[in-house]
UniProtKB/Swiss-Prot annotation:
Subunit architecture: Forms a complex with heterodimeric ferredoxin-thioredoxin reductase (FTR) and thioredoxin.
Organism: Guillardia theta (Cryptophyte)
Cofactors required: [2Fe-2S] cluster
Lineage of the species this protein comes from: Eukaryota, Cryptophyceae, Pyrenomonadales, Geminigeraceae, Guillardia
InterPro entries reported for this sequence: 2Fe-2S_ferredoxin-like_sf (IPR036010), 2Fe-2S_ferredoxin-type (IPR001041), 2Fe2S_fd_BS (IPR006058), Beta-grasp_dom_sf (IPR012675), Fd_pln (IPR010241)
Protein name: Ferredoxin
Length: 97
């Protein structure tokens, strides 16, 4: 099991957390005291949307984002595992629409 550095940045958040490759980014952030937006926790809405600014994630459990949005770097943090050190811009729901 690998652990990656995930930098979270946006709306008063600017922290780097350690996130194992088998833990969702939202869950790891909460465990480390970071309050990020969420609603369904199942990858079926856009409340937790972020944008990958660097690095990569596996969000194959999500069912909301279309291929174009994923191609633009959007990520649902509630169902995203890091696959490298990465930077996520948080609070990006409005950017989806």
């Amino acid at each position: 099991m690998a652990t990656y550095k995930v930098k979270l940045s946006g709306e008063g958040v600017d922290k780097t957390i350690d996130c194992p490759d088998d833990q969702y980014i939202l869950d790891a952030a909460e465990e480390q005291g970071i309050d990020l937006p969420y609603s369904c926790r199942a990858g079926a809405c856009s409340t937790c949307a972020g944008k990958v600014a660097a690095g990569s994630v596996d969000q194959s459990d999500q069912s909301f984002l279309d291929d174009s949005q994923i191609g633009d770097g959007f990520v649902l943090t509630c169902v995203a595992y890091p696959t490298s050190d990465c930077t996520i811009l948080t609070h990006q729901e409005e950017g989806l629409y």
